[in-house]
Amino acid sequence: MAVNAKNWQELKKPNALEKKASGNGKCKATFVAEPLERGFGLTLGNALRRVLLSSLQGAAITAIKIENVLHEFSSLNGVREDVTDIVLNIKQVAIKMQGDGSRRLHISRTGPGVVTAGDIAVSGDIEVMNPELVICHLDQGAVFNAELTVDTGKGYVAAVANRPADAPIGLIPVDALYSPVRQVAYKVENARVGQELDYDKLLLTIETDGTISPEDAIAYSARILQDQLQLFVHFDDGLAPPTSAIGQSSLPSSSSEAENSANQLNRNLLKKVDELELSVRSANCLKNDNIIYIGDLVQKTEAEMLRTPNFGRKSLNEIKEVLSGMGLRLGMEIPGWPPENIEEMAKKLEQEY
């Protein structure tokens, strides 16, 4: 099949993704992408918004069991809120959990005082992101003991689906909002390219619950779309050809052109990042992050690079431009990297040049 690369190469693409912090910079940010072809602002904005709200993984409380409470329409002596209000408050607890599977957390407080999310006893791989959240108020002598069930998932799961078949008496299932993204809004404005205004500018505002940064949220959503759309591409566009292992092409050996392209790709991976002629700032950031070979670099995602100390968008764009000139990009998957004899292979490559 003759591939007409002009179908995508001649479309206007954003030069960079600009971030504008708004409100709480850790949880809320606006991203600006321009210029885009007319109509692409709406297409990308709507697709990203839907994925952000529905498909990102997170953790949430799925059930609660309170001592001396049989059902959610009960009340507790010395507790100002009834159980229904307590459950509503607990649903707002933002939990960050590293592992998978269901966990049990506990709260134990004696009045007088305020029970907050910070009173939840957590293990090392679990963190409560909004410890100041008020759960209930206790009067003098009141006792509040509760067990919380935490699980991981995506999207929204109704309380009825969180009730196990062997649920004990007193277990109250809770609506679980696993999504770490709380709000997404986008708008499309006109963008100027030269004297032309017939282009789109996409402004995407993302607010999270603090368990994930807005940058990571948009990166994950874009990766999900990329993964879903890959099925529809039935041809090789001539960019970095896939490799089954370092030094081995997964394309048919009958094509000498494909073999040469794959060999050149693998040669580039074995080069050291010092050979990229980057700015001093970018080079130092890579050195401090222990990135030695180009093969190490291309496996990093943009989000991972931006988490590197002193590494900003300017350095990111510089590296992306250099890698693009070599037919490489960030976020590549390279099976078998690093090879066991990487130093020997790199030394042999240097001798050839």
UniProtKB/Swiss-Prot annotation:
GO terms for molecular function: DNA binding; DNA-directed RNA polymerase activity; protein dimerization activity. Keywords: DNA-directed RNA polymerase, Nucleotidyltransferase, Transcription, Transferase. Residues 1-236 are annotated as: Alpha N-terminal domain (alpha-NTD). Its EC number is 2.7.7.6. One of its GO terms (biological process) is DNA-templated transcription. It comes from the Bacteria. Pfam families: RNA_pol_A_bac (PF01000), RNA_pol_A_CTD (PF03118), RNA_pol_L (PF01193). CDD domains: RNAP_alpha_NTD (cd06928). It is an enzyme of class 2 (transferase). Residues 260-353 are annotated as: Alpha C-terminal domain (alpha-CTD). GO terms for cellular component: cytoplasm; DNA-directed RNA polymerase complex. It catalyses: RNA(n) + a ribonucleoside 5'-triphosphate = RNA(n+1) + diphosphate. Residues 244-263 are annotated as: Disordered. InterPro entries: DNA-dir_RNA_pol_insert, DNA-dir_RNA_pol_RpoA/D/Rpb3, DNA-dir_RpoA, RBP11-like, RNAP_asu_C, RNApol_insert_sf. Residues 248-263 have a biased composition (Low complexity). Homodimer. The RNAP catalytic core consists of 2 alpha, 1 beta, 1 beta' and 1 omega subunit. When a sigma factor is associated with the core the holoenzyme is formed, which can initiate transcription. DNA-dependent RNA polymerase catalyzes the transcription of DNA into RNA using the four ribonucleoside triphosphates as substrates. Belongs to the RNA polymerase alpha chain family. This is DNA-directed RNA polymerase subunit alpha. It comes from Zymomonas mobilis subsp. mobilis (strain ATCC 31821 / ZM4 / CP4).
